[in-house]
Every structure is written in structure tokens, then in C-alpha cells.
Design a protein with these regions (language model features):
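Conserved glycine-rich Rossmann-like NAD(P)H-binding loop of the short-chain dehydrogenase/reductase
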Residues: 29-46
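Active-site helix of classical SDR
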Residues: 115, 151
Length: 245
């Protein structure tokens, strides 16, 4: 079991939803938390909800200068958790270039910016903790998920490469792949969302992962098996199941 007392964690994308719920759990366990997101007003409200020592640094992960400035302001941390994300459901027939680019820039490139800003100091110290939020949608391409599924697949591959390179270095890398969570983002969906989780429940799954030495957790468990097993299906079977004509 990980010791949280005296630790300092930077949570990016923590002003609401999963990030806010996870910040509360980490903070309640004894770690100091620094919360980042774009909205200063939401960050102030989030910090007020923390049970322990907490602060906020506003940041836009789509802006490299903003990320560098925030990383300098945050300073040395024991761990960083990337939770920032944007989402629009979209079929390719309804292609919206601005939205597709935003999903890639925030969800994937934003993660690379944050990791790139914080990882060198961890490598120099020989210790640290990097937690990345993927998605069940990142295992294989899905209909109506243009931009989002691709961005999450990229994030998941990034986490796998980080894990491969940093094994034995003293830096722990972990990947959490949640399914549907009740947030402002999923309110946009006009389709059924099986096994829909509340942010607090998803945060508990993620926090449980962070207290272990495991690399990856995909949840809810039963629902996640559908996506994990889909990787072994031949294309004809996969698309007949997930994208019937």
C-alpha cells in the first residue's frame, strides 16, 4: 500500500468530474494536491472542496507556453496525473475539423506537453509517479468516435512506451482506462451508455490502481472485457459486432 502522507501530486484536469473526485480521494489520504485546469473560477471551487492542503494553478494544456509556466509554478512533485480531456461525439460524415483537432490537441498532445514538462526532473531524481487517463474507446476504432478514440489510443500507446522505457528507473507509470462516466462530456451522448459510472466510483477505481504496482486498470471490469477481447477479433467479426451496417 502506497504512503500518501507528505507526498505532493499535480492533477491536470481536476476542476470537475473524475479529476475533482480523484483529487479529493488523494487529498483525503494525506497528500498535498495541486489542481490545474483552464477555469480559475472552477479551480477555486475545487480547492475549497479539498479536505487537506491544496492549491491551484490555472493552465491550458493546448498551449505549450502555458504548460511550461504552470510546471514552473507548481515546482517539484512526487506525482502527476493527467485527466484533461475534451469530447464531441462525431461520425466522419459530420466531420468538424476544429473539434477533431481540439480532441487530439488536448487529449493526446496536451498529455505529451504535461509529461514532457514534468518528467525530466523525475528522471534526474530517479523517482516519480506518472498516471495517464486513457479510455475503453482507445482499444480499437469505434463508430461515432472520430477524434476521441484516436486521441485516447495515442495516449494509451504513449503510456505503454513510457512504462517500457522507465521500468526499473524508480519512476512508476500507470494507465487508467475508464468507460462511461457521468460528466458534462457524456451529457452530449444521445445513445445508451452501459455501466455508466459516477465520478466518485471511477475515481475510486483509479485511486485503487495508484496504490498498487500494476501498470494498467480498465474499468468497469465486466464492460472492459468486451473492449479488451475485441483486440483479438478478426476485422470482419469486430466491425460486424461494433459497427453493423
Amino acid at each position: 500500500m502506497k504512503t500518501w502522507q507528505g507526498k505532493r501530486y499535480w492533477l491536470v484536469g481536476a476542476s470537475e468530474g473524475l479529476g475533482l473526485a480523484l483529487a479529493r480521494q488523494i487529498n483525503a489520504a494525506g497528500a498535498e494536491v495541486v489542481l490545474s485546469a483552464r477555469s480559475e473560477a472552477r479551480l477555486a471551487q475545487a480547492v475549497a472542496q479539498m479536505p487537506g492542503k491544496a492549491s491551484a494553478v490555472a493552465m491550458d494544456v493546448a498551449d505549450s507556453a502555458s504548460v511550461r509556466s504552470a510546471a514552473e509554478a507548481v515546482g517539484e512533485v512526487d506525482g502527476v496525473v493527467f485527466l484533461a480531456g475534451v469530447y464531441w461525439p462525431m461520425k466522419v460524415q459530420d466531420w468538424n475539423a476544429d473539434q477533431v483537432e481540439a480532441m487530439c490537441d488536448v487529449n493526446f498532445t496536451g498529455c505529451a506537453r504535461v509529461v514532457g514538462a514534468i518528467l525530466p526532473s523525475m528522471v534526474a531524481r530517479g523517482q516519480g509517479h506518472v498516471v495517464i487517463t486513457g479510455s475503453l474507446s482507445g482499444f480499437r476504432g469505434l463508430p461515432g468516435a472520430t477524434g476521441y478514440a484516436a486521441s485516447k489510443a495515442g495516449v494509451m500507446a504513449m503510456a505503454e512506451s513510457l512504462y517500457a522505457d522507465l521500468r526499473g528507473s524508480g519512476i512508476t507509470v500507470q494507465l487508467a482506462n475508464p468507460g462511461f462516466i457521468r460528466t458534462r462530456l457524456t451529457e452530449k451522448n444521445d445513445f445508451s451508455m452501459p455501466f455508466l459510472m459516477e465520478p466518485e466510483d471511477a475515481a475510486r477505481e483509479m485511486f485503487d490502481l495508484m496504490q498498487t504496482d500494476r501498470f494498467k486498470a480498465s474499468f468497469p471490469t465486466v464492460f472492459s472485457w468486451l473492449f479488451r477481447l475485441s483486440q483479438f477479433l478478426p476485422d470482419w467479426a469486430y466491425y460486424r459486432l461494433f459497427a453493423p451496417k
